[in-house]
Amino acid sequence: MAQKMDCGAGLLGFQAEASVEDSALLMQTLMEAIQISEAPPTNQATAAASPQSSQPPTANEMADIQVSAAAARPKSAFKVQNATTKGPNGVYDFSQAHNAKDVPNTQPKAAFKSQNATPKGPNAAYDFSQAATTGELAANKSEMAFKAQNATTKVGPNATYNFSQSLNANDLANSRPKTPFKAWNDTTKAPTADTQTQNVNQAKMATSQADIETDPGISEPDGATAQTSADGSQAQNLESRTIIRGKRTRKINNLNVEENSSGDQRRAPLAAGTWRSAPVPVTTQNPPGAPPNVLWQTPLAWQNPSGWQNQTARQTPPARQSPPARQTPPAWQNPVAWQNPVIWPNPVIWQNPVIWPNPIVWPGPVVWPNPLAWQNPPGWQTPPGWQTPPGWQGPPDWQGPPDWPLPPDWPLPPDWPLPTDWPLPPDWIPADWPIPPDWQNLRPSPNLRPSPNSRASQNPGAAQPRDVALLQERANKLVKYLMLKDYTKVPIKRSEMLRDIIREYTDVYPEIIERACFVLEKKFGIQLKEIDKEEHLYILISTPESLAGILGTTKDTPKLGLLLVILGVIFMNGNRASEAVLWEALRKMGLRPGVRHPLLGDLRKLLTYEFVKQKYLDYRRVPNSNPPEYEFLWGLRSYHETSKMKVLRFIAEVQKRDPRDWTAQFMEAADEALDALDAAAAEAEARAEARTRMGIGDEAVSGPWSWDDIEFELLTWDEEGDFGDPWSRIPFTFWARYHQNARSRFPQTFAGPIIGPGGTASANFAANFGAIGFFWVE
């Protein structure tokens, strides 16, 4: 009966997964097995009394059993849908024995595990078996193995479900069925070579079957007896049965059947301890449709093994919360208007403001028709503590009444005209006039002493009569002063002309300078040139050929000849020549720095000091040079006294070549000559217009001319140089008179750069220097 109940439960669990044909064939086979198993036992009393040793059936009974078993043997193998075996020996056999002696060894064992049920031990097995007769036990020796859907076994790929029948009793004893079951997604151990055959205690099974058959009310055997022995028994898990709406349902989800092997090769259990069933089974009513002679029992309740503790259930991690949605920033609203500005609670208030006792109230601007007739208002007096502001000056054209008394501490402005009747000490000299160190040995010139009349004429407010004769006299004096200054080749400053010669005629100094230029051009053939517009520096150059002025018959003729050679070296080296290059060219001429020349003197001082001071050369440091290096360039005076074209012609004449042989230098010199012609034409036009406006004509050069009134004392100590000796002034007189008659004696010619008075020694000296100094020019 237990076998029938087990087979029926297995059928209900398998019908959900098997096909229709397999289900029909399985039902037919099970019904035949049930009919055979319901045969009356031969000796029930003996089987119940002696569970350890069962009596074999007679020969006739054995023959009947063999015939029935042969007829009921199934021929088809079933395989659970989507099940996978992982071992070569995973064969599920449902066999039937013919020998009564082998019946105890072929007791069927079915292990079931409910769906999603948790096993509580590897050794907990539920056996629902009932002892039957010898024929029944012998006939019902088939074991059915079912596996849940998608369950996986690790027995091998050749696992099949066979319903076999043994024809020999001995073969039946050795054909012990092996039905491993395993739950979904669980794994069983692969069988090994030393797997032992299953041994079932015949006595215990016979006794328990006999008790269940005779007395349906007897409770189920204890869990300890239901467990298999340690020598290789299988662990079976039986799913609990529930009655829902009067129908018996059974869910097979996880069936674990583990084939037992030797003690050394068996896998260790997952949990410690052994599983034991409850001591008192609970019985329930038979479900509808169950046979009346079958006692329906509920599965034994599981108890926790010794030492077992509930494990903390794995908590589901909290769902990840999505970040809060980004909020739209608030729209910009109108800015809050400033309602209440900060107001000082206690502003500082002057309690007693200073009040002038007699404030001067300005009535408004008053236009006085006659400022000279200004009279004090009646009753007006100067305040006693009144002082003039430190930087205050009166209007330039305002004069007070003739009887206006000046305060005793009233400061006079620096340009205030002195009264005409103020007496001057006999030895009074202005503080800004230069005094030489040996001024005690010098006799001051009467022209240097200011006269009362000259001081009175400096009054800008007084109407100055335009005396042409007086202006021409100052212009002639300025001509002599310029020629004296230019004799030393030092540029002349405008401030020096105003201080030394023009003096009180500062308001008409442009006319005096223009008259002096007219005299220089018409009488001496010299032109006054302003070479620096910022510092207002002037030089004198000869017209129309400046080179004649450079190579004139003066005491500096050798120096100016050397200067012409130096200008050529600079021009042919790209308008600049380093100090090393220039000294190398001079060494080839026999001139060495540090060696004093009989005509030129100290060469280094001549090049780096005298020529630089006279603005013939420009001596400067090379930028970013370490150690410092210096180079030479053309000075401002050189551009006006000569030109690049004249220097290039001089070099070509010395080497007997054409100036156009040096194309780059010739084009540069030609461009400069054209620019100079344009500038000279514009300047000549401006001067002609100014002279017409001022009324300057040929009468300016008429009349006697004398050099006796030249004031040598106007030269400074540095400018005098060789003029410290009075006898050295004689060459200047000759030089001035030479220029006075130069225009009438020498015609204007452009024959070449070497132009001088009748082929004098200056031309020959420059030519000799050039022949030696320009041999390197190619």
Curated annotation (Swiss-Prot):
The protein depicted here goes by the name Melanoma-associated antigen D1
Q: Which organism is it from?
A: Homo sapiens
Tell me the residues on which Phosphotyrosine occurs. Answer: 92
Q: Where is this region: Disordered?
A: 41-60, 78-123, 182-333, 376-412, 440-466
Q: Give tissue specificity per the record.
A: Expressed in bone marrow stromal cells from both multiple myeloma patients and healthy donors. Seems to be ubiquitously expressed.
- One GO process term, biological-process aspect: regulation of circadian rhythm
Q: Where is this region: 22 X 6 AA tandem repeats of W-[PQ]-X-P-X-X?
A: 296-444
Q: What does this protein's UniProt record list under function?
A: Involved in the apoptotic response after nerve growth factor (NGF) binding in neuronal cells. Inhibits cell cycle progression, and facilitates NGFR-mediated apoptosis. May act as a regulator of the function of DLX family members. May enhance ubiquitin ligase activity of RING-type zinc finger-containing E3 ubiquitin-protein ligases. Proposed to act through recruitment and/or stabilization of the Ubl-conjugating enzyme (E2) at the E3:substrate complex. Plays a role in the circadian rhythm regulation.
Could you tell me which InterPro entries the record lists for this protein?
A: MAGE, MAGE_WH1, MAGE_WH2, MHD_dom
sequence repeat start-end pairs: 296-301, 302-307, 308-313, 332-337, 338-343, 344-349, 350-355, 356-361, 362-367, 368-373, 374-379, 380-385, 386-391, 392-397, 398-403, 404-409, 410-415, 416-421, 422-427, 428-432, 433-438, 439-444
Q: Where is the composition biased (Low complexity)?
A: 377-397, 440-455
Task: List, alphabetically, the GO terms of the cellular component aspect.
Answer: chromatin; cytosol; nucleus; plasma membrane; protein-containing complex
Q: Where is the composition biased (Pro residues)?
A: 398-412
Stretches of Polar residues bias are at 104-118, 185-211, 225-240, 253-263, 300-319
